């Protein structure tokens, strides 16, 4: 994976092509990125998202030689993917994020049919995990992610990989906080990391089977 999306377009092509040329010598595939996701990843900070421009994808793929392409259609990094003012609220006051730009994805599919597409920043930020963290001393406010029904739709398209990281962090943090509050005298990491591991495993099991539809496809 080489993310040059924070560079100007031509610089992104140049940097990505260098990685591709080196990696392909060793039969290593390379994922490039076009379009910017808001948030922080690997010390790269972006204040706001910039949607992928479909008219650039053919040129980018051809000139870089990447094997897959991460695009920006409304996902973003972290557990606070959208500001409250970007969302609506349901009858219970729960923040509802804006929908993903599937029109952009469909146009990209039309321009580079069959090419593997990737989505980063696709955690759904489960409300029950946020509540669990806050119940046991956390202070997470206005956390909101990508609805799972939208991820299911994406998984049925040309999207071959969907990155989900923050949900795993939430699961582990929630389990550790609960374990330490329930057992304040505990100091053996095995006693609180064990529950964290179990909840993490259950989370990704549900994602693989119920959201991504990728079970038995390894």
Per-range role (PLM):
Residues 119-124:
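Short catalytic/ligand-gating loop segments at beta-alpha or beta-beta junctions
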């Amino acid at each position: 994976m080489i993310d040059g999306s924070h560079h100007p377009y031509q610089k992104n092509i140049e940097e990505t092509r260098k990685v591709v040329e080196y990696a392909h010598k060793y039969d290593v595939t390379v994922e490039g990125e076009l379009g910017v996701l808001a948030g922080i990843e690997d010390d790269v900070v972006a204040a706001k998202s910039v949607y992928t421009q479909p008219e650039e994808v053919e040129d980018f793929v051809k000139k870089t030689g990447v094997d897959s392409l991460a695009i920006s259609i409304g996902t973003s990094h972290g557990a606070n993917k959208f500001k409250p003012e970007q969302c609506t609220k349901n009858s219970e006051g729960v923040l509802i994020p804006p929908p993903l730009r599937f029109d952009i994805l469909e146009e990209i599919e039309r321009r580079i049919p069959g090419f593997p597409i990737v989505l980063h920043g696709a955690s759904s930020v489960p409300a029950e995990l946020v509540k669990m963290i806050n119940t046991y001393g956390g202070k997470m406010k206005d956390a909101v992610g990508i609805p799972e029904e939208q991820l299911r739709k994406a998984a049925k398209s040309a999207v071959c990989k969907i990155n989900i990281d923050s949900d795993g962090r939430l699961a582990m943090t929630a389990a550790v906080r609960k374990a330490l509050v329930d057992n304040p005298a505990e100091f053996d990491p095995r006693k609180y990391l064990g529950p964290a591991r179990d909840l993490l495993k259950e989370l990704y099991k549900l994602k693989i089977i119920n959201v991504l539809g990728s079970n038995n496809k390894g």
